[in-house]
Amino acid sequence: MALGRHLSLRGLCVLLLGTMVGGQALELRLKDGVHRCEGRVEVKHQGEWGTVDGYRWTLKDASVVCRQLGCGAAIGFPGGAYFGPGLGPIWLLYTSCEGTESTVSDCEHSNIKDYRNDGYNHGRDAGVVCSGFVRLAGGDGPCSGRVEVHSGEAWIPVSDGNFTLATAQIICAELGCGKAVSVLGHELFRESSAQVWAEEFRCEGEEPELWVCPRVPCPGGTCHHSGSAQVVCSAYSEVRLMTNGSSQCEGQVEMNISGQWRALCASHWSLANANVICRQLGCGVAISTPGGPHLVEEGDQILTARFHCSGAESFLWSCPVTALGGPDCSHGNTASVICSGNQIQVLPQCNDSVSQPTGSAASEDSAPYCSDSRQLRLVDGGGPCAGRVEILDQGSWGTICDDGWDLDDARVVCRQLGCGEALNATGSAHFGAGSGPIWLDNLNCTGKESHVWRCPSRGWGQHNCRHKQDAGVICSEFLALRMVSEDQQCAGWLEVFYNGTWGSVCRNPMEDITVSTICRQLGCGDSGTLNSSVALREGFRPQWVDRIQCRKTDTSLWQCPSDPWNYNSCSPKEEAYIWCADSRQIRLVDGGGRCSGRVEILDQGSWGTICDDRWDLDDARVVCKQLGCGEALDATVSSFFGTGSGPIWLDEVNCRGEESQVWRCPSWGWRQHNCNHQEDAGVICSGFVRLAGGDGPCSGRVEVHSGEAWTPVSDGNFTLPTAQVICAELGCGKAVSVLGHMPFRESDGQVWAEEFRCDGGEPELWSCPRVPCPGGTCLHSGAAQVVCSVYTEVQLMKNGTSQCEGQVEMKISGRWRALCASHWSLANANVVCRQLGCGVAISTPRGPHLVEGGDQISTAQFHCSGAESFLWSCPVTALGGPDCSHGNTASVICSGNHTQVLPQCNDFLSQPAGSAASEESSPYCSDSRQLRLVDGGGPCGGRVEILDQGSWGTICDDDWDLDDARVVCRQLGCGEALNATGSAHFGAGSGPIWLDDLNCTGKESHVWRCPSRGWGRHDCRHKEDAGVICSEFLALRMVSEDQQCAGWLEVFYNGTWGSVCRSPMEDITVSVICRQLGCGDSGSLNTSVGLREGSRPRWVDLIQCRKMDTSLWQCPSGPWKYSSCSPKEEAYISCEGRRPKSCPTAAACTDREKLRLRGGDSECSGRVEVWHNGSWGTVCDDSWSLAEAEVVCQQLGCGQALEAVRSAAFGPGNGSIWLDEVQCGGRESSLWDCVAEPWGQSDCKHEEDAGVRCSGVRTTLPTTTAGTRTTSNSLPGIFSLPGVLCLILGSLLFLVLVILVTQLLRWRAERRALSSYEDALAEAVYEELDYLLTQKEGLGSPDQMTDVPDENYDDAEEVPVPGTPSPSQGNEEEVPPEKEDGVRSSQTGSFLNFSREAANPGEGEESFWLLQGKKGDAGYDDVELSALGTSPVTFS
């Protein structure tokens, strides 16, 4: 044993006097490293940052730092101010972490003070090098592979379910691997066998690293996936012209590869490659590629990668590259280029076959030899990176047929043109029909070819197509430009659409000529100004490009030189806000909406009106078109919408109806008039959007008005939030469904040329963000169709005695109407009660006593199952109902705070003709099956289970898809189906499997009415159980950096975390929230907290909980929507309780991590402390023996127990005494499996704290070396008798050695004496056991073995081996089967579930009593040795 070297007095002193600092975790940071996860460790105390002294700094301390910072695993722990000396205080002299703590505050450490006052300096400042939070594993290098993040314990793969390119970009940038080239599923790399990370990352693409990206927890703790996400990065991140070049547009080519600059070899270097670099650097085009060493420095590292550019790429790393197999490169043969700067030069479009002199770069005079003169372009797509594919051959441009056309083919086209990744491969002449020859047909590219004409095909010019089958592509480098402002068209924040995302433009430096180019491109006049005094813009977005310097010859922003495009080209305060000269604005006021009212124009800072002389429908058409308000319905005069104020800008306006702006129509001239404000003109427009072709104004094909005609909107990327905005704008309630072109006749007109990207909180469709479709035509299979609920609210009103009793009224298209009782049932009534938060329905009384005669009656018939959350979620028959008398209107009496279970029935109801279901007539249930979702964390996500004939069973996932999931979500009133999961995603169920091969259309009322194999027929097992995730899945949390029971209140709804509004939020509501979160019974609303940063949904307002509510979901509230209030009204709650942490670490933990030793001379000796109810506490030494110590040592992985220490020998602990009268058998795997008094119940003081000393040592503490400053000077009086301590330790070591030698001698002697009599001696063993049992019954024999007192080691042979039962334990009682052989049952009551009673040894059993060293055969010798943690040994 090597215990001696671990027991230096200095190390023991430090361990004993290490002070635990309570309160919140110390704030940490790493400084002066190359990234966030390495550097000098600094601690913030009293508002000031200071360092940690590197004395005794270990990998375990570094591991805790990395875990606290979310930086993965510790891979280095340099001291000696490796990252430079810090400034300011030295706050910590040492830390003593075990390595499993979640924060440094959980470790023992020195008092926090400035140790510079004690003579210490920054020369030993501690540092850390962490692995980082994310890595790419399993690929061909650090820049490609499976995405894995570090939990603080292990690397865990990330699901590919909702993994985005924006997230991949963050990962590649963080790893120094350039930009993301592709995001793949599990097929490229070997799938990890570990679990999948339980969160989805929602990066926007601008974050500095993955750790700070927003995250969303996966329902049930497991993300839906088909494998782990895979990312391939480019590795190349920057390019420059450097060294001896005379300017930034001339010099040697160098690339930043994984953080290092390297020169590029001239092998295969061509003018086409050089042209790409000049374009990328904003240096015009390449003039020449000079050879020779005059541009080269000998110290450069040479990169032998060979690029194969066509010359049209935007970035060098967009070109095909051969990274392997290149020859060695001399310094005289590195690539260089001289760019034109601001000259314009056209580069021939050639393929990548270049004639090059051996051993030298292409010279300035040698033009590239083009072995293939074909050229490629995209036309009619609105830009060079989207459109119909055309190839030039033999002087003629021709097209490609769409037979077999797919993304692999499109990838080749996009790569060849330098347009990034392929987003879409279009067919059917999506960008219009071409003309001329059709060059290719039946193309079958692998996606890796350098040119599209090198892919397999029918042959050049061979086809069976017409131009209506012309192929097209949309690439990621497609660009667009806009200004963003709430109320202006020609002034606002300048944004570009790039790489699939809108982002801002930087203003530094932006001269007048650049602003003029932008204004002309946007049709906003010929000049403008840059506004640098506008307030900082809210929210986050990319800043795509900086240093734009347009020239007089440029006609668009895309032609202007600039810095390279990247995600963060500047800071948010440098985003450009531009005013163009033509910045007049127009609005309609006092008309009740944006699209009707008095016409007003803003000019030179003043709003003025238009005189109504000659004002007619043609003038109104121009106004409606200009505002995006559809067609003109009326042109009002004589101040129909009230009189305005300010100037009268126009009079005698005489538009033709075709003008783009009303001030461009003929008139008397600006400010020329003979009117007053009694003659102010107005308009009434139809509005921007309508639903057409349905059965009313609230369902149908989505159409928007272009100013000329109604145009349908594409269903390609149409979303539910967009539908919600449309329904709300039209006064049609909420969106029930979004469909394709099936239910309604497709319009003959063109499709709207933009995609709407509504968040759901916009007041109207016009104000939603939009993205232009490439080529002006959106990809679609038809027009988008929306069905709105029409019904927006429900109430119980009139003669009812409370809000939970009365006549049922519904708000239909903005008007309240009573509901006829036709088909009114208790199931329908129960949904109304639930929706209003009024409990369940008690009865549905009929008769006029709850009715007023003036009500309008709705004859809609609802067919609820009773489980829906909203009445309008039920199937409804709106047409064909009979007339309804006022005496037959629906009514209900709800329980209020009563609880009553409603039978789950289908929608077939027996009802008397002409009357509502009476209170006495219970519904007739033709089908008593029930449906539920389990193990998903809420009622709207989980494994699908059906109750039939008293048994809950599951559905097999064969053919399980979103149509099936839609039926389930609708049936449960859980909104839209977001995901249909298979493979027991929410865990395997039990019981029968009721359905298999389900094939729903999505419109069935109940899932068991869908076509299937038949009830109970299947060929599945429960590992194929189906599940769903619905949009109404809810969760609740508080968000705070350092508190568990205080923070910003957030709900998870519709797939996103969002905040809760605080107005009005009374004490009872706060109490319900605190109880639901396990944070006590009361709390307070904090209104003085600062405004929260960032943007998020604000899902719900006006929450008013009642005394009977047990969760937030039961409380009445305002309607749930995206923006229910302003950011300053978000709720911040502080609860009085403190939710106890279930684990001492941040992550899930095992029993081993809930047990520790403190105050000892090594990590395997000390006072026993256990974690319970959120805090560490001690164990009382009553009944504490070597058996209990053995369990502790084994649980901690510290070998065998050497001593069971009592009487607080390692110092008294503090806090609770969690356990008393612990009684173990010695074989338990965990202390929790032993019998004990109930948690926290003891009659002890800390002077009786139990401890252990184990044989093993898990860590090695550094010994003190000469010349190292000791801590005894600053910490006096730790040990007054060091000699006594050494004597005790030496004695213990000696006794342990004596015990081991004695045991080995006994075993060896017995084996030699008995080796020839194995059978006879085995019989003798059992006789001896019987004799021992007889002896134990007496309890008075002096020969009996007893527990050895702490100080008694006189008789080594009688020291009980761990696990030996106490003599006080009888053996006559029959031991229950669940306690035999140490098998544990679940912990119940006050016991830690294992009895110290030993089972009777039976035939074939290995009893613990055999470990007492009695005679036995060789098999028992093996057991004896194993009990001491030693491998069986054969002695000769």
Curated annotation (Swiss-Prot):
Q: Which UniProt keywords apply?
A: Disulfide bond, Glycoprotein, Repeat, Secreted, Signal
* Ranges where the SRCR domain occurs: 28-131, 134-234, 239-340, 376-476, 481-581, 586-686, 689-789, 794-895, 931-1031, 1036-1136, 1155-1255
> Which cystines does this chain contain?
66-130, 97-107, 172-233, 203-213, 265-329, 278-339, 309-319, 401-465, 414-475, 445-455, 506-570, 519-580, 550-560, 611-675, 624-685, 655-665, 727-788, 758-768, 820-884, 833-894, 864-874, 956-1020, 969-1030, 1000-1010, 1061-1125, 1074-1135, 1105-1115, 1180-1244, 1193-1254, 1224-1234
Q: What is this protein called?
A: Antigen WC1.1
Q: Could you tell me where this protein is found in the cell?
A: Secreted
Q: Name one GO cellular component term.
A: extracellular region
Locate the compositionally biased regions of type Acidic residues: 1348-1358
> What tissues express this gene product?
Expressed on subsets of CD4-CD8- gamma delta T lymphocytes.
